[in-house]
Structure formats: C-alpha cells, structure tokens
Amino acid sequence: MAAKEVKFGREARERLLRGVDILANAVKVTLGPKGRNVVIDKSFGAPRITKDGVSVAKEIELEDKFENMGAQMLREVASKTNDIAGDGTTTATVLGQAIVQEGVKAVAAGMNPMDLKRGIDAAVDEVVANLFKKAKKIQTSAEIAQVGTISANGAAEIGKMIADAMEKVGNEGVITVEEAKTAETELEVVEGMQFDRGYLSPYFVTNAEKMVADLDDPYILIHEKKLSNLQSLLPVLEAVVQSGKPLLIIAEDVEGEALATLVVNKLRGGLKIAAVKAPGFGDRRKAMLEDIAILTSGQVISEDVGIKLENVTLDMLGRAKKVNISKENTTIIDGAGQKSEINARVNQIKVQIEETTSDYDREKLQERLAKLAGGVAVIRVGGATEVEVKEKKDRVDDALNATRAAVEEGIVAGGGTALLRAANALTVKGSNPDQEAGINIVRRALQAPARQIATNAGEEAAIIVGKVLENNADTFGYNTATGEFGDLIALGIVDPVKVVRSALQNAASIASLLITTEAMVAEVPKKDTPVPPMPGGGMGGMGGMDF
C-alpha cells in the first residue's frame, strides 16, 4: 500500500478552498447573457469553445491532490444539478463557492462547523419553500420560448424552436438534439409511433420513387415469434383479403417460405401487405409490442397468453389510419387504441421511470413514453464550423432541459433576482449564535449569482443589487442584456424553479460537507527515479569505440 499524506484542520480547509476557487473562477465567467466563453484544449482535433458550466467543470483536474479534492467536490455540485434539472450548473457552482468561502471563514473564527451546517440547511429549506410559493405556472407557448431563450444565452430562435417542438409533440414527447450537416438549424417532427425497423423485402414498396411502403387504414398483426410458414396464418389472411384492407405484419422475423409467399401475393396484386421485424430485444421487445398493441387496439399474438396463430380473428388485429414504412423505419400514425388504455399504459411507464436506477433503462422508457404519448421531434443544430456547432448544441441542450424543468415546476424571475428576494424574506431563526451564522452565510451567498451576472456584464455589482433591493416588487430586477430595470417576468427574463432550487440544494449540500471537513488523506506522489546512465566503454570486445 502506497504511503499517504494527511492534512488537518485549517490547512486542510484552505487547500480545499483553493481547489474550489480555481474551478469556480473558471466556470463563473460563463454566467448570464454577457458571460464569456471558455476554450478547452483537446488532445486531438480543434479546441472546444463553450459557455456550459458543467462542460468546463468536467475538464478541470488539478495537480495538487488536496486542491483537486476541493475542485472535484464542487464539480459534483455542477454534475448533480445537471442530472436533476439539466441546467443551472454555473449558478450552482457560484452558490457553492460563496457558501464554502463564508463557511471556511466562520470555522476559522472558531464557530462550530456542525451548527453552521444546521443553520445552512434550515435557511435552504425556507428558501426552497419560498421559491415554490412564488412560482408561476407556464401556460403558453410564448412563455416556453422565453425560458428556452434565456437558457440559450439570449438566442431567441432556439427558444422559439423548442417551443414549437413542445407544442407539436406535447410535454411528454421526446425532443432530441443532433448535429446537422448544413449551416441551418432546423426542426423535424415525427408524429405517431416510430420504431427503427424497415420493410423485410423491397418488394413490399408501394411508392417506387421514394422507396417507401404506405398502407392506408391497415390491419396490424402483432406476433411475438418467427413466421417461417404461412399455413397457420391462412385463415386470418383470407379474412383480411375479404375486408379489402391492407395488412402489416410485425413479427420477430418472417423467413423463407413465408416471406416468399407474401411477396408473390403482393406482386400478383391480391394482397396489399408489408412485413417488418419487431423492434427491440428480449423483454424490451415484449414491452414494445404490447405498446404497439395498446396504441392500435390490437392484441399481441403470443403462446404465452394462449393465443395460437390459426385461431386469430380480425378483431384481434390492430388498426391505424396510416402506416409508413421506409428501408430503416416504420411509423404508425393515428392508431385506433382507446385513450383511457393508452393513458393507463403511459402512467405505468412513468412509474417505471421513477423506480429505475439505470440511466440507460430510463432513457429507453422515456422513448417508449414519448412514442405513446406524443411523438418525436429532432432539432438539428447547424453552424459554419464544427466548433460553432458543438458550442451551439451545448446551448440547445441546456435550453431544452430548462424548458422541461419550467413546465414541471413553474418559473420565477430570472437573473438571480428570485434568490435575492428569497434572501430578504428569510425569517428562520437558529437555536444558537453559530446556527444564526450559518443562516447568514446562506443570506449572503444568495446574492452571489446576481452579482456575478452583473460583473460579467461589466457593471458594478453592488450598485445593481442595491437598486434591485430598493424596490419591493417580487419580479422587479435588472435585465443585463438591455441594461434596464423592470418587471423581469413581463420582460421574459425567467428561470425554472426546478433549476434554481436544485442549484441551491446541491451547492449547500456539498458546501456543508466541505465546511465540516477536519482531515484529508491523499497518496504521496511517487518520485520518478531517473533512468540510470548507459554504461560507458562501448560494446564489449570492440575496444576503442568510446565516443
């Protein structure tokens, strides 16, 4: 086991604080509409330019082990806030730094760290309650656009695009962000349920120009197993032919004789038909087939539930207004499922999302939820250079997360104003002077985001904060982008409650841990032993070759 170095008390806290300051000072320059960029060196390719706090925080690694511990713990504040709310990472970092700085001073002055922590926790709880009380629910698409614009650092076109996407796919719909191949940023919406399986044979195509199969008002057979011969399928095929409607077969696979027979029937014109593989794998495939069945008011034909292919009747098949099948994707539009059954399934998936601990499972469940509840929108981010596209994509991701958070828990006045007001409204009392000091630490720290936004804009922070606090209206604040004071909600300068409260809760949680640190242990860095010099004298037996 390698030797360890141990630091105690004041020295330990000072080293931690130094690490916190290095990371926070790099991150906080990005805060606000006039925040600056940070350039991050990459070991290959062009450097990355970003205004996203968590991206900067993740890149910082310090040489000194003890300072690095402080930096990594503050990085955790940004990461946690990003995981919960998807935005507000810079605000969280600024709050964390402010609480740690004040807390370390208080401990150095002889106050009890545990009482300070209790005071900090009590103050944070009251501020969060205050934020919920002041929250304004989001109703209109214009309000969603405002939130997106603020989070994208004032880019109105990004805010509007996100609002359009949310309007089209609903609040539950999936909105993904991709890099475009062109200079334009565009929005593409896929309505209905789409899964990534295309037709099994190009002979199923109905539109040879576009190479797609369009089925209008089809029956949909959802089968869990492989189909290799059609003997057992004949009764249902005959019933479909008599009805004059097209048929879509979704099965694990359609092979050999079965596929050949379907293609021959299609080419002879007797049967409008297409077959696709079932989406997903294993248990996820079963769940997705069940989703399709509920969406189309059909049944999954499976021997698990005692239904054999030969006994299938038309009423067991799903229905939809239209099915569009390309080489790679199948889209079911306007399924005939009952609204109540779809809603019950949506609620069931929501419960699974809450309970799952795996990020991958959560992502897949959210995709299923979106396909059932609304649809899928893709925002393709364009730009003149790769560096610009990556920077813009960071901002779109932030804006998207912020708008989702705003829809969930409402909005408050932006620009750090809500926290300023909450600091003024703090009434909680500590049970001893040290707890009071903890409450005052939070009271002062709550001014930090507003001050930093003003500083980044080249303003005098103390004057701006003073003017804002002179007016008692909750939503009165400073619009840094235009340099005017006014009602921030009316001006569209808003922050989602979820982002603001997550930033504060995570900052206080990690900062409290740093303040209550009394000892630190780190490995002693290994000293590199120099490589011994080559023995002189040239090669043996070849005297006289010394150089």
UniProtKB/Swiss-Prot annotation:
A single cellular component GO annotation: cytoplasm
Biological process per Gene Ontology, one example term: protein refolding
Gene Ontology molecular functions: ATP binding; ATP-dependent protein folding chaperone; isomerase activity; unfolded protein binding
Residue stretches of biased makeup (Gly residues): 536-547
Enzyme class: isomerase
Any single Pfam family the record assigns to this protein: Cpn60_TCP1
Key words, A-Z: ATP-binding, Chaperone, Cytoplasm, Isomerase, Nucleotide-binding, Stress response
Keyword set includes Transferase: no
Compartment(s): Cytoplasm
Enzyme Commission number(s) of this protein: 5.6.1.7
Catalysed reactions listed for this entry: ATP + H2O + a folded polypeptide = ADP + phosphate + an unfolded polypeptide
InterPro entries: Chaperonin_Cpn60_CS (IPR018370), Cpn60/GroEL (IPR001844), Cpn60/GroEL/TCP-1 (IPR002423), GroEL-like_apical_dom_sf (IPR027409), GROEL-like_equatorial_sf (IPR027413), TCP-1-like_intermed_sf (IPR027410)
Chain residue ranges for the region called Disordered: 526-547
Annotated positions binding ATP: 30-33, 51, 87-91, 415, 495
Recorded family membership: Belongs to the chaperonin (HSP60) family.
Entry-linked HAMAP family: CH60 (MF_00600)
Subunit composition and interactions: Forms a cylinder of 14 subunits composed of two heptameric rings stacked back-to-back. Interacts with the co-chaperonin GroES.
Function recorded in the entry: Together with its co-chaperonin GroES, plays an essential role in assisting protein folding. The GroEL-GroES system forms a nano-cage that allows encapsulation of the non-native substrate proteins and provides a physical environment optimized to promote and accelerate protein folding.
Protein name: Chaperonin GroEL
Organism in which the protein naturally occurs: Bartonella henselae (strain ATCC 49882 / DSM 28221 / CCUG 30454 / Houston 1) (Rochalimaea henselae)
